[in-house]
Every structure is written in C-alpha cells, then in structure tokens.
Amino acid sequence: MKRDYYEVLGVGKGADADEIKKAYRKLARQYHPDVNKAADAEEKFKEVKEAYDVLSEPQKRAQYDRFGHQDPNQGFGGGGFDASGMGGFGDIFDMFFGGGGRRANPNAPRKGSDLQFGLSIEFTETVFGKETDVEIPKEAECDTCHGSGAKPGTGVETCKTCSGTGQQEVAANTPFGRIVNRRVCTTCEGKGKVFKEKCSSCRGSGRVKVRRKIHLNIPAGVDDGAQLRVTGEGEPGVNGGPPGDLYVVLRVKSHEFFEREGNDIYCEVPLTYAQAALGDEIEVPTVDGRVKLKIPSGTQTETFFRLRGKGVPHLRGNGRGDQHVKVRVITPTKLSDKQKELLRELAELSGEKPGQHGGEDEGFFEKMKRAFRGE
C-alpha cells in the first residue's frame, strides 16, 4: 500500500511550494543511488520523486488532496463497469483468474518507458550554464530484425495456444456459479502470432542495448537535484507508440571554497589581527574572478560583508543573487620575541595586563562567568 505523499516528503498538508521543494531536494540527495549504496535507496528515491511530482503540481496536488491515491476516474464513469473500481469484486476476479485477466489490448500502441540518468557537474557550471554531450545507455530498435523480433527470412506462424485470437478462455467454479473469463494469451502475449525463429541479435525482444549521444543545454542557475527533460529520448515505444522521455538528474559537486544557499553564495576569508584592528583592502575570490573588499577598522571575527550581484543567476528571471563573505580573525600561534614584546606594549597601552581582561570586554566575561555559575 502506498504511503501518504506528505508523509514521504516529511511535510505537513499545509506546506507551501518552497517547503515541498526543499524537502524533496534533501531527500533526493540522501537517497540518490549515485550517493546512497543501500539496497533500498533506489526504491526510496523513486518514492520521493513520485511524491514530489504530484505535490509540486497544483492541479495534481488538488486532486490528490481530494481523492488520495484512488483514481477518481475509476468505477462507472465513461467506460462502463470496471471491476477494479469496485473493491471486493475486483479481488474476487483476481482470486480466480489472476491479476492479468483484464489487461488492455496488448497490440495497442504504447508509449515507451521514461529513462533517468544522473550527471555530475561542477559548482561553477551551475552559475554560468553549460552545453555538453553525454552518452546515455538505453534500448533501441534492433537493426537486424527492424524491431520485429523474428530472425530475418523466417517469418511468423499462428499461435497454437490461442489459435491466433491472442486471448485464452479460463473457466472457474465460483460461489456465483461457473464463470468463463478471457485473458491475454501468455504464449504470444496477445499478438496471435509467434516467431518461427527468434532474431539472434535481440533474442526475440526486438530491442538491443546501445549508448546514444545526447546534447544537453544546462541553463545557468540550476541547483543540485534539478531535472532536465529531453523529450523522445527514452525507451522506444511499443507497437508503433511514441518513445518515452529522458530525465537527467543533476548532481552538483561540492566546492572547496564556495557554498550555495538558494541563489546566494557564501565563503569565508581569513584576516590577521592587524587587518581587523586597523582596517585594510583585501582581494576576495568570486565566481567571476577576484574583487576588492574594504575591511573597516575594528572589524570583529565572523562579520559578514555582502558583494551584490556576485551570486547565482535566477533560473526564471533576471539578475543574480549575492555573495556573502564571512571574515575570521586568525590568532597567531607562532610569535617571535619581538612580536610578543610589541603585543605586551599594546596591552599596557590599553590598560591591560597580559592574561587579564578589562575595559569594554569586562562586562562580556563577567556575563560568561555568571552564566557558568547559573546566576
């Protein structure tokens, strides 16, 4: 039984679109098969994606909130009586005939399956975008038999199991009397024909494994977990149906200096004691190159400075986020005798003695002492 989609994403039913997107990204990153090697990681990833696909679309979400996992089109609507929409009756038919008795026409055209492919990209490529070619493993129509599955020149023959009808009749005694049900022939899979000899290249499947080169245009501003849809590059269709689509899931590599939150970039730079006390003009790395940043005198450690427009471009809009620079004052650990002497002189000029605190900082340390004493 499927779990509630809100429960899967760990959000409440009143969650807004941003909360749902944030929860999805966190869980997708946690369970993605490229990262998580647990046996159930792939299933959990699919469950998370399915929940997000529904809850991120307003129309689908509204329908889910009203009907849950139950298809509102089941039952007596349009297509007449459907045993699967009648609960217990569907179970009774399954009990006597199996779940495959009411399959749709197997010869009808069907869309091919969608494919999912994980692609790792660099941090800076999310900022500026990228065009690239990737090779995708997929199934394609067999060139030997042109998708028929039969060995060239051998042809097909009428299925002996169903006499070419594509269906089998199965009778069973039930509490309602003797019931005869039709189901898809298991020998020919409803086609009514079987191969005299299977194609040796595809072993009768009509498909072979290939690697197809796909051109991707990664837009600037994408984030980790984003999906690019490439229409028609999924598995080939069945019985002349259209091919499925390809979904490329982007995995952004971590950067040794930059971190990203939304469209803003964060980094940390060191300052010497003299730079923090006296002020300075330093160079700060950005994704666009180095820029000048003025540090005012008396700057404290962990102070943030903003570089406007140096963040990540907005994916659907104009402009870019900002870069936030946190400075950290580095305390020297190896001092020469001369440096120690100068620091002692500075302490004395400030009215302090080495190892003691006074002046404006006294109140801060007194508060710390009282907090430790529980006062």
Swiss-Prot record:
PROSITE patterns: DNAJ_2, ZF_CR
Keywords from the named record: Chaperone, Cytoplasm, DNA replication, Metal-binding, Repeat, Stress response, Zinc, Zinc-finger
Residues that hold Zn(2+) 1 according to the record: 142, 145, 199, 202
GO cellular component: cytoplasm
Pfam families xref list: DnaJ, DnaJ_C, DnaJ_CXXCXGXG
Zinc fingers (CR-type), renumbered ranges: 129-211
Entry's Gene Ontology molecular function annotations: ATP binding; heat shock protein binding; unfolded protein binding; zinc ion binding
GO biological process terms on file: chaperone cofactor-dependent protein refolding; DNA replication; protein refolding; response to heat
Cofactor annotation comment: Binds 2 Zn(2+) ions per monomer.
Domain J: residue ranges: 4-68
Region Disordered: start-end pairs: 349-375
Cofactor list: Zn(2+)
Subcellular location: Cytoplasm
Disulphide bridges, residue numbers: none
Binding site for Zn(2+) 2: 159, 162, 185, 188
NCBIfam families: DnaJ_bact (TIGR02349), PRK10767.1 (NF008035), PRK14280.1 (NF010873)
Function text: Participates actively in the response to hyperosmotic and heat shock by preventing the aggregation of stress-denatured proteins and by disaggregating proteins, also in an autonomous, DnaK-independent fashion. Unfolded proteins bind initially to DnaJ; upon interaction with the DnaJ-bound protein, DnaK hydrolyzes its bound ATP, resulting in the formation of a stable complex. GrpE releases ADP from DnaK; ATP binding to DnaK triggers the release of the substrate protein, thus completing the reaction cycle.
PANTHER family: CHAPERONE PROTEIN DNAJ (PTHR43096:SF48), DNAJ HOMOLOG 1, MITOCHONDRIAL-RELATED (PTHR43096)
The protein's name in its UniProt record: Chaperone protein DnaJ
Lineage: Bacteria, Bacillati, Bacillota, Bacilli, Bacillales
Name of the gene encoding the protein in the UniProt record: dnaJ
